[in-house]
Swiss-Prot record:
Protein's GO biological process: mRNA processing; nuclear mRNA surveillance of spliceosomal pre-mRNA splicing; RNA splicing
Protein name (record): Pinin homolog 1
Primary localization class, coarse: nucleus
Subcellular location: Nucleus; Cytoplasm
Length: 197
């Protein structure tokens, strides 16, 4: 790096001091080459600058070749980066599409799971409702049975108490108990007591 920088500095200094008047006449160009017979250059140079001139021409040739190579390398590098970018974009698209597919599969699984859970919950609620209904029916039945028993007990108590009273023959019947009983009333009360449960 240091050698190249020093060479470039020398070239700049020698180019400033050696080249003062350069005249190039128009020369016919054949196949991209200048015809040397018709052209002439007048250069006022001090002696010993031919080597530097040759060295500079070689350097310029090398730098021009290097710049062409650099440009070519940059183009190739750009093309390579473009290709890599395309592959990266394609792989990202594939990953995104794969992610979308996985996400869709996952959402489908979740939807199925939710549906199954809802069905299970509906079944559980239905079973619980049936159990609750059966319990309520049992409770109603037990309550009705208890009411029937209470009614029967009450009827027995009433029938038993009725056996101590006389009844009128008119409707609605009235129950009464005279303070003094006649013998016929006494036999009627005894008969009612024997019929009572």
């Amino acid at each position: 790096m240091k050698i190249l920088a020093m060479d470039e500095r020398r070239e700049e200094l020698s180019a400033k001091s050696t080249v003062q008047n350069v005249k190039i006449s128009e020369a016919p160009i054949l196949d991209g080459k200048v015809n040397n017979e018709d052209s002439h250059m007048e250069i006022d140079q001090p002696e010993g600058s031919m080597e530097e001139d040759d060295h500079r021409q070689v350097k310029e040739k090398n730098t021009s070749e290097n710049s062409v190579e650099q440009k070519r390398g940059r183009r190739m590098f750009g093309a390579l980066l473009g290709t890599l970018g395309k592959f990266q974009q394609e792989s990202e698209r594939e990953q995104k599409s794969a992610r979308k597919v996985k996400r869709a599969e996952l959402e489908e699984k979740l939807a199925k799971r939710r549906e199954q859970e809802l069905q299970e919950l509906e079944k559980q609620e239905k079973i619980e409702a049936e159990i609750l209904e059966s319990r309520l029916q049992e409770q109603r039945k037990v309550a009705l049975d208890e009411l029937e028993l209470d009614r029967n007990d009450l009827k027995k108590v009433l029938d038993n108490k009725k056996s101590y009273y006389l009844r009128t023959k008119t409707q609605p019947s009235l129950f009464y108990r005279p303070y003094y009983l006649l013998p016929s009333q006494r036999t009627q009360l005894e008969q009612m007591k024997s019929e009572a449960p």
